[in-house]
Amino acid sequence: AVCDVVPPPVAAPLTWHSFDGGLIEIGHTGEGFAFDNEGPRHRTYLHPYALASRLVTQAEFAAFVEGGGYQNPMLWLAEGWDWRAAQGLNHPLYWHRVEGAWHHFTLAGLQPLQGSQPVVHLSYYEADAYARWAGSRLPTEAEWEHAAAQDTDPVVQLFGVAWQWTQSSYAPYPGFRVAEGAVGEYNGKFMVNQYVLRGSSCATPPGHERLTYRNFFPATARWQFTGIRLARDLG
């Protein structure tokens, strides 16, 4: 996991796994604990798509950085480019150049990049720009959940590594009703100007890791262990 201080083994080759799409169901079934934003369970339609077998690595993202990804406005959403320019950003949070080589600040202090480790601490804008550079896109939350509910042997790092940005705006599911009182304050009033993240990170506490869990952050958030899983359209 990205919280580990021991360098991981070489990353497995990135492969693509296809899903037929069609009319599917997502959301919590109502059995066991879930937050109100995880339901109601409902049907949605998916076009055929492919999901990457693993998360994007530090080495892969470094190629984006070195290839001028932060200087190419064609790769960025308009608001993302304005934010990047205003902040003067040219690399991910916690990355530093030391004697010509990229390092990143970790829980064990400043360390050289571990190329096979998933890249984290990325905003939605950075994740989206990288996906465009890679000839791909970010998955929707329905695509992510549908894939994760299948036989996931070929699709790894779904949980416990990094929260994965989706291109889905954080909004209520069909039939959602804000609960009365203080309980309704938590999710209902935050359903605007944020994006959904799926999975969980190495820093996720117990009880916040399940197939239907919907995390959410504004597009500029970088402080969490947030990473990238790529998706592509088929047909």
Please provide the spans of the model-predicted regions:
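Extracytoplasmic and endomembrane cell-envelope/extracellular-matrix remodeling and assembly machinery
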Residues: 4-19, 23-25, 30-32
